[in-house]
């Protein structure tokens, strides 16, 4: 049996005997052979040395490492490899040991390996923090390949405490692993990781992005068009990407972005070469994922704007009322001391009305100041739109003159609204200007 066929068989038998519910609690989602081969082929091995070191954190059954070594030896006949795998799961360790032994037997002296049965994060926390207990010369690697655990943890979890410089908001093991792997690389060395897309934007991941994109630079990204077909055997509904990072401060001119429909059709790959500044942009270091030239042009045009809403004294806020929590303050019909409560269903054709929304409660009493807001100029935006809808960004102008009998109104938290940061009121020109921007095709595509 060929090398990868053997590993696939061993992995399949393990998955059959280990319930998915147990693996999910551990954050384990196993990589297919097809994905492992694709990831192995993403590395640049043109300047490969005679002896290289490979790290696989959270190795599982070892399929990623073995796919990489299989490719390496097929192209570099004189290279030998030293493998380091981290794995703590007692259930999968026997499979990993068997697979690495099979690899060693296939290539004899060209392969040496060790399995470290320690926590990947905690065992290196002093080194990562560079404190007094850190090793003088922590081990570094030529290549890192990984499919890290996807598991939300609390901020007081030991792993989160061990890596404070990358934690802000709600931590997840996957980006702690990615940060540590970048730390583990030699200068100018590469890592290939399969991770969720969630880190590419948002405040929770800002600290991670600052570390990840300053210590390293993106060389390549692979996207899956269909999110339910990445870990198809695992039935995971998670938007996922594969990323190739180089540990360097030098920014490349461009990033190669490839895409396929799923993890089983790597024969049909679309390629796009994108300027680096169109991928990583702004003070927040958001990562944009264009898949065609039109997407690139949209990003370039948006980046031409010289100011943001906060720069102009404006802020996007979320509707105040969480209806299922504040139902005691809600009313089905207007009455004494009631105010109109606005839902996303009230945003229609660029305006905001208060026709029946289809919700049970369209009114709120005015007894709690924290649940109501001034009746003044706003732009309302739907927070969520159905996938089949033509426009992702749907908004409407809220005009206080349409509801002039009320001093205050209520907004349900499925809408966002644009307001002045200082609590004042936008003039009509600003209100309609913001609406025109948000309602444009450019912003909708963005």
Residue ranges and their predicted role:
Residues 24-25, 29-38, 59-66, 80, ...:
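Signature of N6-adenine DNA methyltransferases within the class I
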Residues 50-60:
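Conserved class I S-adenosyl-L-methionine
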Residues 110-119:
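Conserved SAM-binding strand-loop segment of SAM-dependent methyltransferases
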Residues 297-446:
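Polybasic, glycine- and aromatic-enriched phosphate-binding surface used to engage nucleic acids
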